[in-house]
Amino acid sequence: MSFMRGGSECSTGRNPLSQFTKHTAEDRSLQHDRVAGPSGGRVGGMRSNTGEMSQQDREMMARFGAAGPEQSSFNYEQMRHELHNMGAQGGQIPQVPSQQGAANGGQWARDFGGQQTAPGAAPQDAKNWNAEFQRGGSPAEAMQQQGPGPMQGGMGMGGMPMYGMARPMYSGMSANMAPQFQPQQANARVVELDEQNWEEQFKQMDSAVGKGKEVEEQTAETATATETVTETETTTEDKPMDIKNMDFENIWKNLQVNVLDNMDEWLEETNSPAWERDFHEYTHNRPEFADYQFEENNQFMEHPDPFKIGVELMETGGRLSEAALAFEAAVQKNTEHAEAWGRLGACQAQNEKEDPAIRALERCIKLEPGNLSALMNLSVSYTNEGYENAAYATLERWLATKYPEVVDQARNQEPRLGNEDKFQLHSRVTELFIRAAQLSPDGANIDADVQVGLGVLFYGNEEYDKAIDCFNAAIAVRPDDALLWNRLGATLANSHRSEEAIDAYYKALELRPSFVRARYNLGVSCINIGCYKEAAQYLLGALSMHKVEGVQDDVLANQSTNLYDTLKRVFLGMDRRDLVAKVGNGMDVNQFRNEFEF
């Protein structure tokens, strides 16, 4: 499979801009919000179709090409007066030939040949620099001789006139101006000092400077030596040196703090499998999430077993916000409760609160690295937030935990993979999951989780048809899994099959009516087909399920901004700006019940 989407390899030798494109094709997926589809602006930007030149343009081009040296746009008359005024204080400056006179080649050659270059660069001869400056060639002449050729040639780059003309203009000036300046340099070297005289003069100047430096260095060395002797004498007289205890004790303490205290961590990192090191590399190379923010008002803090209450709420279809509070109480009572952290993360993800879900799932994996459910849920959350490399590395860790023989065999063939971009990492992890899927090809013992992992990988690479096949294969094994139906619906929606996606979301809500994310996705699909009122009803229904009895929405630590922002879009699509003003954190959803059913 090929995962390269760019076409920068075509004609790279003829188009320098394609080389620039290759430098900008680095993986920055950790800095993006979502997986974006192909940009519609590329088609317009690469157009090279140009219309036929009009008669007005032809006349303008003819006038421009017929312009002689007399119509130059470079006028140095004002600069000549400025230089004359500046040099009047130090001496008389020779008159600069006018621009029209400069165009006379014979007179200019006689003036140029009659000049003499100053043999030295002493400060008293600084007034001669003005004369030397005046003897330089006129850039205006070079532009007049050059003509409009390079600019016209550069305007033909399809859709990119500025980049197309910049490089030819620069190269044209260099090529045409270089022959004009080379004779000046050759004539100037005739009156320069010969090699022997130049070396003698340089030695004299270097000797004068060296003597000053030598005196300064000797003075500094003397002062340093005196200061060192004084410090040594004071130390010897006031406090004898204790060689046995002076330095070694401090060195040993620093060694204990910096090395021995971190020995376990260092050994764990050194002895850990290669896939484990890759996991830490890719997951840590993203924006760090803060610690999980707990709700202040939690009615389950006084309950003796809040974890049990949370599990019951999830299994019986209770409100996800209440189940999240129960799991929060459980982890606050026991911060090392890995299963509670994992269920809290899964609950928040289903409640359309991705950030707290990632924080909780990462905490679970830190406590229990082999928690397969948390690893799979975390990879999905990473994908939703656009952290694709972290998602792929998490899937590899999941596979290494459940199918170590597949990963170990691949690692033995290529122990250390080095730095990989998004496409290389995706290709390698996808190949590993395909090998794992081939372990049960008959379909009877198919691993639904392997199919889910493959579906997430294909989804991240925008291969939606393959992802749909994988999720359908997983649903064939677990037809009552609401999560699978929701993931199938999201994949169908991204492949522009909104009607089929709506059916999948309905199935997910039929299995779990409190599934807030499925309601949110259903509202988005309704927006895509222009059913704004139905979309508003689903979004308002999802927001109503965030309501917790006895707790105000505006004081919740974890809120879903996606729901509020999408609801505003719906009201704008309905041209109901009066309703847009009512949407915000802490709003009372009951105020919309007069117009919407939810």
Swiss-Prot record:
There is a cross-link at residue 22 (Glycyl lysine isopeptide (Lys-Gly) (interchain with G-Cter in ubiquitin)). This is Peroxisomal targeting signal receptor. One of its GO terms (cellular component) is cytosol. Keywords: Cytoplasm, Isopeptide bond, Membrane, Peroxisome, Protein transport, Repeat, Thioester bond, TPR repeat, Transport, Ubl conjugation. Residues 1-54, 135-154, 208-237 are annotated as: Disordered. The keyword Transmembrane helix does not apply. Residues 220-233 have a biased composition (Low complexity). Binds to the C-terminal PTS1-type tripeptide peroxisomal targeting signal (SKL-type) and plays an essential role in peroxisomal protein import. GO terms for molecular function: peroxisome matrix targeting signal-1 binding. Residues 9-22 have a biased composition (Polar residues). SUPFAM superfamilies: TPR-like. There is a cross-link at residue 10 (Glycyl cysteine thioester (Cys-Gly) (interchain with G-Cter in ubiquitin)). Residues 23-35 have a biased composition (Basic and acidic residues). It is found in: Cytoplasm; Peroxisome membrane. Belongs to the peroxisomal targeting signal receptor family. It is a peripheral membrane protein. TPR repeats lie at residues 304-337, 338-371, 372-409, 410-447, 448-481, 482-515, 516-549. It comes from Yarrowia lipolytica (strain CLIB 122 / E 150). It holds the Pfam family TPR_16. One of its GO terms (biological process) is protein import into peroxisome matrix, docking. Ubiquitination at Cys-10 is UBC4-independent but requires the presence of PEX4. Ubiquitination at Lys-22 is UBC4-dependent.
